[in-house]
């Protein structure tokens, strides 16, 4: 069965970038159609990414906190995990959010076409779905087709014991021994979940630190804590993977590589993602796609074809949902005739591990590469009353300031709920705040949040909660 429809805007992909673009288009009075390969809206993020991982991380955190409370005089029995019920909880979270999106699409009169969409011309798209073919004629298109996990040619990915992030989130079983390939955010988050559920975790990372994009001093605090849970093999890489009946045998080389191949019950490959740009027949619409699958856009998110836009993972790093959402808003507003641009000063990054690692703006490495003269100020949570009382005093808040203007240009937090504390720093950078602006803002006490203000006081030389290195000598 084949049908044909006409619309002002078609959005290819319904992840956070795609549905945000579609809903914004509808709110601006544009007739809008979403094409989505999943049966529900939300894309990778809501279905097999950000949201289910946070549901499982919540479970992991509760398990770990229950164990830790013994030191405070509250002793529980050994946690008993029911994997089926945990999986049901995860699915409940997903269904609540995807159901909400379906309701908002209906309320906005956004038509949803399920299936795989590919371009057949500059103004036509063909969707292959379970119910047949749908041809969509459009005036404008927004490509939000996302990304997928990287696969390596020497790894037998067809073996069910070789996982990507989607497989790990299915929570089919808890392996006795799990290897995480890649010390980035996805691998560490999944390692956190499976460690809490009982797995022995090895992490192999080719760089000299996990979370390579973050500053070393922040990662050092994190590594000290996480090393008690994971066996970290830094400056090491996997060279061979062999699937046998009794397990997956992995050969490694490098600084921490074992001498012999190691047997694992499962291997999670979490070494990054690649864009889906080559899967759309975008060339038939005249849209240029580079060798890696990325689509180049300008600050209004236009491709080289003026009426076709691209947003989200498919336009480049960082591959983060919140970046894609803002890109989606801009693309919709430009189509509606507004002179808007995507030109953020900062895009925050967060590893939702325990402790969390979060940063925004420039890192020290980036400031050095740009030739910026900078100064850092840190506030250790060991001096925070709230952190000590909440048993999370191993955290740290760090601000990076331009040495001449004293404006904040970057910041990072490592500690419990660190990501929740990052917003003030991001806003300060966007608004051009300097150290004095932050230091003179009264922060509630006792909170973890006040560590941002106290770090600014360290820079200003007005700190009284720590020895003051800038105090006048007597």
From Swiss-Prot:
Concerning Gene3D superfamilies, the annotation shows: 3.30.390.30, FAD/NAD(P)-binding domain
| Catalysis: reaction(s) | N(6)-[(R)-dihydrolipoyl]-L-lysyl-[protein] + NAD(+) = N(6)-[(R)-lipoyl]-L-lysyl-[protein] + NADH + H(+)
The free-text cofactor remark is: Binds 1 FAD per subunit.
| Residues modified as N6-acetyllysine | 220
Q: What are the catalytic residues?
A: 445
The protein, known as: Dihydrolipoyl dehydrogenase
Family recorded in the similarity comment: Belongs to the class-I pyridine nucleotide-disulfide oxidoreductase family.
- Function of this protein? Lipoamide dehydrogenase is a component of the glycine cleavage system as well as of the alpha-ketoacid dehydrogenase complexes.
Upper classification of the source organism reads: Bacteria, Pseudomonadati, Pseudomonadota, Gammaproteobacteria, Enterobacterales
Its EC number is 1.8.1.4
What GO CC terms are in its UniProt record?
A: cytoplasm; cytosol; glycine cleavage complex; membrane; oxoglutarate dehydrogenase complex; plasma membrane; pyruvate dehydrogenase complex
Positions of disulphide bridges: 45-50
Write the gene name: lpdA
Q: Which organism is it from?
A: Escherichia coli (strain K12)
In terms of InterPro entries, this protein maps to:
Class-I_Pyr_Nuc-Dis_Oxidored, FAD/NAD-bd_sf, FAD/NAD-binding_dom, FAD/NAD-linked_Rdtase_dimer_sf, Lipoamide_DH, Pyr_nuc-diS_OxRdtase, Pyr_nucl-diS_OxRdtase_dimer, Pyr_OxRdtase_I_AS
Assembly and binders: Homodimer.
């Amino acid at each position: 069965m084949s049908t044909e429809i006409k619309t002002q805007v078609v959005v290819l992909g319904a992840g956070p970038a795609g549905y945000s673009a579609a809903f914004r288009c509808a709110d601006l009075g544009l007739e809008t159609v979403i094409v989505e390969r999943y049966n529900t809206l939300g894309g990778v993020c809501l279905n097999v990414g950000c949201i289910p991982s946070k549901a499982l991380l919540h479970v992991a955190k509760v398990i770990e906190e229950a164990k830790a409370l013994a030191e405070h005089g509250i002793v529980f029995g050994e946690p008993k995990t029911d994997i089926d019920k945990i999986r049901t909880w995860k699915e409940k979270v997903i269904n609540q959010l995807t159901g909400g999106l379906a309701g908002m699409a209906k309320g906005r009169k956004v038509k949803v076409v399920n299936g795989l969409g590919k371009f057949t011309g500059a103004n036509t798209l063909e969707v292959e779905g379970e119910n047949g073919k749908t041809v969509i004629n459009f005036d404008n298109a927004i490509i939000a087709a996302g990304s997928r996990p990287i696969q390596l040619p020497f790894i037998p990915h067809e073996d069910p014991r070789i996982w990507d992030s989607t497989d790990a989130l299915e929570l089919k079983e808890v392996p006795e021994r799990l290897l995480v390939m890649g010390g980035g955010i996805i691998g560490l988050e999944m390692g956190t979940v499976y460690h809490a559920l009982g797995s022995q975790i090895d992490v192999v990372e080719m760089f000299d630190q996990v979370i390579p994009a973050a500053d070393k001093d922040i990662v050092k605090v994190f590594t000290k804590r996480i090393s008690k849970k994971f066996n970290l093999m830094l400056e090491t890489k996997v060279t061979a993977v062999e699937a046998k009946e009794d397990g997956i045998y992995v050969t490694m080389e490098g600084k921490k590589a074992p001498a012999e191949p190691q047997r694992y019950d499962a291997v999670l490959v979490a070494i990054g993602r690649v864009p889906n740009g080559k899967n759309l027949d975008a060339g038939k619409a005249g849209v240029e796609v580079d060798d890696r699958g990325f689509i180049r856009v300008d600050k209004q998110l236009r491709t080289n074809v003026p009426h076709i836009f691209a947003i989200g993972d498919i336009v480049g790093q960082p591959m983060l949902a919140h970046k894609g959402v803002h890109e989606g808003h801009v693309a919709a507003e430009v189509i509606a005739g507004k002179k808007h641009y995507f030109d953020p000063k900062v895009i925050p990054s967060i590893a939702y591990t325990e402790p969390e690692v979060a940063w925004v703006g420039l890192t020290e490495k980036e400031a050095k590469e740009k030739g910026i003269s900078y100064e850092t100020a840190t506030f250790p949570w060991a001096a925070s009353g709230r952190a000590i009382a909440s048993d999370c005093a191993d955290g740290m808040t760090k601000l990076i300031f331009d040495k001449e203007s004293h404006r904040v240009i970057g910041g990072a937090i490592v500690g419990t709920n660190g990501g929740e504390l990052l917003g003030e720093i991001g806003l300060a950078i966007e608004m051009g705040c300097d150290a004095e602006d932050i230091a003179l803002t009264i922060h509630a006490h006792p909170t973890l949040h006040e560590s941002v203000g106290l770090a600014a006081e360290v820079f200003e030389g007005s700190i009284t909660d720590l020895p003051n290195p800038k105090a006048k000598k007597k």
